[in-house]
Amino acid sequence: AILRVGIDTGETLAVNNGRNGNREPLFLGDAANHAAKLASNLSTKGIYLTNAARLAIGLKEVDTPAKTALTKEEIKDCQDAADLDVTAETIVKEWREDQKNNPLGGFVFTRHTPPFSTMDIPALTPGNSRRQEAVSIYADIDGFTAYVADNIEENAENVVRVLHVLRAELERVLTTEFKGRRIRFIGDCVHGLICEGTAATTEVQDTISEATRLAGAFRSSFDLAIEKLEKKKYFSGEMGLAIGFDYGPM
């Protein structure tokens, strides 16, 4: 396994993301986006800082932040400055003790009877897991990061409002109209699953056909939501929706 960390600093919006017991914090803004890109840009391990973050802690700018990891000396300086009362060795030791005292046990996979909208994901355990063929679909709001950057200082309330409206609409289309299952929100992207068939068999053609219809419904609902937000003067600008899906074992 390779651990790669990306860090940036700047003004961000912190929002409570999700509904119905599936809440998690989400940070909006250039800093969050740049940090994520640094973390996922390449496969080499290490801690990578943008030039803004490097300057904030007194380091010099570099020509290629995505290829310049912190040195051991720079990491030690950060540790000394932070004066943390915990070490990596302590965390690993406690983790191993927890694994010993609370073993995961064996994994048991069964199939879920469609529609996936009835799947209670929080109730799943290693011994009560699901595995079957289905479509995994992503709908990503294109241009939202630029919209946040343009409005974070003067219009932060509408940024959060637009995000919640658009994602709620996408989730409603997925779960209510097409009986799919939202897996999670990833920033301004929604990830879901959809399956047609029975507990014993996935109907491949029907599943892919419904996923294609779902992609069209995503776009139609997104365009309508943007139109209504513009009429209410909550939004002005350019945003689009990028959709991709694939079929296989989940």
Regions found by a protein language model. Give the residues of each.
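Intrinsically disordered, glycine/charged-rich C-terminal tails and inter-domain linkers
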Residues: 23, 43-136, 143
